[in-house]
A protein has these predicted regions:
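Active-site-proximal alpha/beta segments of enzymes that process anionic O-linked groups
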Residues: 1-98, 207-209, 218-224
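Membrane-interface soluble catalytic domains
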Residues: 16, 20, 28-36, 47-53, ...
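A long, amphipathic alpha-helix that forms part
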Residues: 36-49, 53, 84-142
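Short beta-strand segments
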Residues: 59-66, 115-118, 142-147, 181, ...
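Proline/Glycine/Serine-rich low-complexity intrinsically disordered segments
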Residues: 62, 104-108, 112, 120-123, ...
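Histidine-centered active-site/metal-ligand motif
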Residues: 67-69, 105, 149, 161-167
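A short acidic (Asp/Glu
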Residues: 71-75, 153-158
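Short, solvent-exposed loop/turn segments at the edges of secondary structure
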Residues: 172-176
């Protein structure tokens, strides 16, 4: 009776509100309510959007937090289930974390959950893009997907772990959020190692559409000139604005990076201020 009522810690709570009780990297019971709310939007984008012929350009911007809410999903489609069991799939596809000779270490539940939610989000976005193709609005649409940050201390790639003399060991991929751009009538996939920041988003969005764009709030030109050369950045643990809430950043350790961020030689420790 005890094991029946306990049910791996969920106590037979409603499936949409019971937190996952994981068992290793392949099995989970329960769901993350925060994930379901965000994921459901991506899953139903084709039902929430419609294509129509107009004589003017259109602009759509949306924010979604699916990849902020981690949980295991059911493979191979990476969909949420109350009972997740990927044991067989994981055994048969253990090589899926290696690409072009580079292997991502996905051995802990925290790492696997991050992998799953990103797979689920990208697959659902891909389904929406298929819907756009079917309705003739994919090629004439510029699409930009920008994330706000990487996964903190995921430590999946050995060559991205920096050992700074004063700051200690850091996973620099914390500061490498996803940035994808699909231009008008583009085809195929391309990886570009050009140094980019999220501030490049409006530059790319208006490229070729608005001549010499200006920020309407500041009156300054919208361009990427400021990212040339070494870029200072703060690696602060105080991300919560209830703690870091002054007019300046709370004291923390500063670093700089330039050009290819995947070359640890381009990272430098500065000081603490």
């Amino acid at each position: 009776m005890h094991s029946f009522l306990y049910n791996y810690g969920t106590y037979y709570d409603a499936s949409a509100s019971a937190w996952q009780a994981y068992d290793g990297v392949s099995q989970d019971i329960g769901m993350n309510e925060g994930f379901l709310g965000c994921y459901s939007v991506l899953k139903n984008l084709s039902c929430m959007t419609a294509a129509e012929k107009t004589d003017h350009d259109t602009f759509l911007m949306m924010s979604n937090s699916t990849t902020h809410e981690i949980q295991l999903l059911q493979t191979p489609d990476y969909t949420p289930k109350y009972y997740v069991d990927n044991t067989t799939y994981d055994l048969l596809h253990s090589d899926r974390f290696t690409y072009n000779g580079v292997t991502a270490h996905i051995t802990a539940p925290y790492q696997m959950k991050h992998y799953h939610i990103n797979m689920g989000a990208l697959l659902r976005m891909g389904e929406w893009f298929d819907y756009m193709r079917e309705n003739g609005v994919y090629d004439n649409t510029r699409i930009i997907i920008a994330a706000d940050h990487g996964a903190p201390e995921l430590c999946s790639f050995d060559d991205m772990i920096a050992d700074f003399s004063a700051g200690g060991i850091k996973d620099v991929l914390d500061y490498n959020p996803l940035f994808l751009v699909k231009d008008f009538n583009s085809r195929g996939f391309k990886t570009d190692m050009t140094f980019m920041t999220n501030a490049d988003t409006p530059v790319l969005a208006m490229k070729g559409l608005i001549s010499e764009p200006v920020n309407p709030f500041t009156g300054k030109p919208v361009n990427s000139d400021a990212k040339q050369g070494e870029q200072p950045l703060i690696l602060s643990e105080l991300w919560d604005i209830e703690q870091n809430d002054g007019n300046t950043f709370a004291p923390s350790r500063w670093y700089s990076v330039h050009d290819n961020i995947f070359d640890l030689g381009n990272w430098k420790e500065l000081d603490f201020h």
